[in-house]
Design a protein with these regions (language model features):
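Ubiquitin-like/PB1-type beta-grasp interaction modules and other compact soluble beta-rich domains
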Residues: 1-131
Length: 131
């Protein structure tokens, strides 16, 4: 799991590696496994990521409703051996998506009004084998 706090943040990218993730677990469960604090919105408390490790601050994002790109939001990316070595935006939310052996997942903070909604994670995944 990769957490990229965005280009305007002074926070370092967080990278957590997992080897034995049960296939019945969702990507949302990876937050608990990594000891990262995650908050959902009031509408989707375990389905839409609003805040990771206190970012953005409660003053910036109240997490009552689903934030828009104009307000600032987290973008969710995945990659796995069948996709090659590049990132793609996930077509599913974290509560539905299942981790893939050898894959990576990334969360990128998109600053409101920045126009960088297509920005990829600031981390290059390396191929991994699965047992």
């Amino acid at each position: 799991m990769v957490i990229d706090f965005g280009e305007r943040s002074d926070r370092e990218v967080i990278v957590r590696d997992y080897t034995d993730v049960p296939t019945e677990k969702s990507s949302w469960d990876l937050f608990a496994a990594s000891a990262l604090k995650v908050e959902g919105t009031s509408n989707y408390p375990t389905g839409f990521v609003c805040r990771i490790e206190g970012w953005p601050s409660a003053q910036k994002q109240d997490c009552l409703d689903t934030p828009t790109y104009a307000e600032g939001t987290w973008a969710y990316f995945v990659t796995n051996p069948s996709l090659g070595d590049g990132w793609v935006m996930s077509g599913q939310g974290a509560s539905i998506h299942k981790p893939v052996c050898g894959g990576y997942e990334a969360w990128v903070w998109i600053e409101g009004g920045s126009g960088d909604s297509k920005r990829l994670p600031n981390y290059t995944p390396t191929p991994r084998s699965c047992q």
